């Protein structure tokens, strides 16, 4: 880590790369081959690293940025004319999802931009490992072009430094919730600077109870695996991680579905062995704090299992306790899937769905669109 002082007296640490090099770099076209080659090499390095295998979030990132996946992603974009990145992207990642900075960086690189990322002071082991692997791959001579497009900086809560980078940026990628977004927007930027902001959002899943009740053991296990990916990756910190599970069906079918589904999810969690004791403790602490601070919780089930379920007195108030994490899910029931609309608003990012036919899915999508939801995806694809 190299302490730096600019001529205007601003101080920050260059954790990786050089600010000067990034400022002097030229933008590339989207999905440029040097970037694709670097990310493919990074994916390989992560997947082969022995320490990384004990860090499921890092392994997930490495798998996501493998070249074959990025090639599929590139195939979704068709450009009618030659295009290049906007220039410099200044990233302000969140603190609650440690490896989010890596995903943000990949997006900046794939869009052809030079990137300066502000890292938080949170010293997570997977962040240190990720940066070390990024550095090791960038150090290879064949990746010099990409090396000059990446700089990771760290500094305290200093608006002067944030304003400095904001003034240089052509794009700002701002994570961290409403307060962070509003604060960053109060800082001066160039007249053509574009902000990509991720404000406070939450997500939920809608599950067809009859589908779960009638599924085979293999189908149930596969559904539980898909739900686990959405609900437990990043310790339920991602905006697209479901915080609420809404069951569609009559009282009996919902009861039968719950009795099958949650033990299957617990079995997946036990098999994967990724839930640490500290996660269980944090879940209990957060739940107790919620019970003290609100009057909406009426019952809690499965607190000693991998999946704690919370019942509330008024399901329309579910977002009041949407900060619960580490495998804690508010539950609600609707008889008709379209009734989900009363639980949706513009703070809902993702609605995951499971077990519905195409006709019902179309009606659900219409309800979600009216509610202001960004997207409707199959359970298991919420983090894509």
For every predicted segment, state its role.
Residues 107-110, 136, 186-191, 368-369:
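Short, surface-exposed basic-aromatic patches at helix termini and helix-loop junctions that form
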Residues 74-138:
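Conserved small-residue-rich beta-alpha loop and adjacent elements
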Residues 143-251:
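Conserved NAD(P)+-binding/catalytic subdomain of aldehyde/semialdehyde dehydrogenases
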Residues 75-90, 96, 153-163, 310-323:
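Donor nucleotide-activated moiety binding/catalytic core segment of transferases
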Residues 234-352, 360-371, 376-384:
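NAD(P)-dependent aldehyde/semialdehyde dehydrogenase
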Residues 113-116, 145, 164-171, 344-350:
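Short, surface-exposed connector motifs at secondary-structure boundaries
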Residues 92-95, 119-120, 153-155, 174-177, ...:
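Short His-Asn-centered micro-motif
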Residues 1-87, 377:
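N-terminal Rossmann-like NAD(P)+-binding subdomain of aldehyde/semialdehyde dehydrogenases
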């Amino acid at each position: 880590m190299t302490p730096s002082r600019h001529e205007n007296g601003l101080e920050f640490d260059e954790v990786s790369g050089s600010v000067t090099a990034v400022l002097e770099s030229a933008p590339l076209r989207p999905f440029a081959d040097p970037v694709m080659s670097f990310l493919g090499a990074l994916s390989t390095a992560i997947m082969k690293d022995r320490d990384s295998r004990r860090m499921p979030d890092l392994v997930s990132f490495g798998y996501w940025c493998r070249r074959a996946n990025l090639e599929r992603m590139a195939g979704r974009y068709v450009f009618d004319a030659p295009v290049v990145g906007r220039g410099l992207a200044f990233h302000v990642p969140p603190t609650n999802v440690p490896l989010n900075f890596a995903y943000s960086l990949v997006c900046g690189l794939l869009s052809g931009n030079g990137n300066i990322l502000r890292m938080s002071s949170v010293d997570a082991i997977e962040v240190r490992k990720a940066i070390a692997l990024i550095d090791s791959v960038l150090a290879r001579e064949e990746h010099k072009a990409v090396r000059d497009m990446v700089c990771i900086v760290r500094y305290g809560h200093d608006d002067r430094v944030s304003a400095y980078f904001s003034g240089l940026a052509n794009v700002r990628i701002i994570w961290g919730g409403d307060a962070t977004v509003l604060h960053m927007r109060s800082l001066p930027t160039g007249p053509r600077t574009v902000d990509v902001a991720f404000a406070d959002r939450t997500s939920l899943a809608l599950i067809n109870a009859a589908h779960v009740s009638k599924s085979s053991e293999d189908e149930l296990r596969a559904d539980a695996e898909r739900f686990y990916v959405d609900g437990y990756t990043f310790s339920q910190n991602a905006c697209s991680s479901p915080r609420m599970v809404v069951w569609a069906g009559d009282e009996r079918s919902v009861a039968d579905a719950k009795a099958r589904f949650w033990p299957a999810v617990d079995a997946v969690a036990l098999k994967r062995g990724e839930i640490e004791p500290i996660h269980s403790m944090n879940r209990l602490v957060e739940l107790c704090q919620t019970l003290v601070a609100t009057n909406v919780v009426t019952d809690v089930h499965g607190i000693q299992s991998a999946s704690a379920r919370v019942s509330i007195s008024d399901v329309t108030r579910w977002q009041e306790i949407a900060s619960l994490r580490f495998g804690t899910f508010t539950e609600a029931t609707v008889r008709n899937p379209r009734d989900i609309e009363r639980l949706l608003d513009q703070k809902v990012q993702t609605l995951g769905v499971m077990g519905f036919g195409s006709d019902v899915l179309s009606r659900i999508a219409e309800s979600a669109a009216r509610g202001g939801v960004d997207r409707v995806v199959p359970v298991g694809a919420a983090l894509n």
